Amino acid sequence: MIDLHCHSTASDGSFTPTQLVSLAEECGLKALALTDHDTLDGLGEFRRADENSPVECIPGIELASQDAENSYAGYHIVGLFLGAEASEEMQRLMQRCIEAREARNLAILERLRHHGIELSLTEVESAAGGEVIGRPHIAQALVNRGVVLSIQGAFDRYLGSGKPAYVRRRLPSPETAIAAIHSMGGVAIWAHPFTRGNYTVRRIHEMAVHLKGIGLDGMEAYYALHTVTQVKNALEICEDVGLLPSGGSDFHGAVTRSIRLGVGTGKLNVPDSILADLEACRDQRASAR
């Protein structure tokens, strides 16, 4: 069993990269990919943990992107097998992501003020505890203030899509995300395709064709929140379009307590057999560089 999608404290997870590797060993995983949101910051520690672990540790990332030319809600692109050195292309993209996230955070605080909630950036930084600040930390600051009872309550009332303090983040195009992943020798995977909007199988197929045309290598067919039917449909799309199937739990630790590493809600089983094709794709890219 393998898990090619999880998050650490370098983004919005509650386990450090080292703790994730230890947990993967306890779970009996053959391979684990660390795919933090829009950052490479946890990969150094992840690689060091790999030195003494029987688990194959695969350096990765998850990049949020938006295609301005269609109405799709957005694509999350996972990069697997990233090289040790960040490419100039990836560094530029990371800087854009940082600037966009910081601008969004300030805009959210301004909207909260407009609704009578004076929340300072210092309070949010305290809630983040040194992590990259995002909406979950603003939510925690609202909990700390007593404005809401829970993080989920903060999203339901203020921070979720369509709520009073929601601010859409400026995102790179999927072409840019895929190219940045390839610039580091990585394999580009469309993450959790059936969870980003209420789309038909036909529509998902159309999106897969579009992404394949701009360089996508694979699609996350196995995913913690995919139904059995969705897994089947995703595998059929991969076969039809010529994409490699991938899969993972999207484990965040305490942030999503119902999702466990390796097994998701308990039914996830990402087969070891898909790893060979993904590694072959990585090797093919390396030989072409």
Residue ranges and their predicted role:
Residues M1-G134, I214, E220-V241, P245-T256:
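A metal-dependent hydrolase metal-coordination microenvironment
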Residues I259-P271:
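Conserved, well-ordered active-site substructure
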Residues A49-H210, L268-A288:
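Extended substrate/RNA-proximal surfaces in nucleic-acid metabolism proteins
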